[in-house]
Amino acid sequence: SKLMKHFGQSETLTPFLDSLYTRSISFRNFYSAGIHTNHGLYATLYSFPAMMKRNLMKGSVIPRYSGLPTVLKENGYYNLFFMTHEGQYDNMNAFFRTNGYDEVFSQENYPADKVVNSFGVQDDFLYDYAIPVLNQRAATGEPFFATLLSISNHPPYVIPPFFHPKTSEPETQIVEYADWALRKFFEEARKQPWFDNTIFVLEGDHGKLVGDAECELPESYNHIPLMIYSSRIHPEE
């Protein structure tokens, strides 16, 4: 959260997220369940606390959980998960298919020339890929639940050659890019017939160290933004 101007960032790194914050039901005091992506996904989607030294999505026998994806599936929703990297990373493909998701899209689905590093494709490609898939689901007339896991603000950073950041450090340039890619996704989504009937929930899976570490587990590791946006809801904080 501390990369956003609303939470004290002196530079304007996230103009789109900052603007979306004021147009959403937004939460100032929201904290992640852990400090790794698997912690955030597990807690957010299935409402179980993270086990700090254990990845509960891994294992030869995949446990079944009740959570948002499974409850929605029981009520007629079609569930899709989009990630940038390989499906086997953190056992995500097998875990999510076992626990409520109908389709999982990962690096294996994307053109090889779009893979830029060990974390697969970049955010803007993931968003561009997702739009037509969501259009196909919307055309069926059935409700859908889609989870998009972005990755760009995670080292190793890759700044696309077509993106021109205003700052000079890779750590801030990648934040600018991630914000730009998200803006581009919303601009495209707004053109689709399902946009006005969709609730968008944006949150961080975990934080990162911003500034100096004042204690063993700095607040910035867990303090994350949460925004619930729809063209049909009134903003509040």
Annotated model-derived regions:
Residues 1-237:
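Solvent-exposed soluble domains appended to multi-pass membrane proteins
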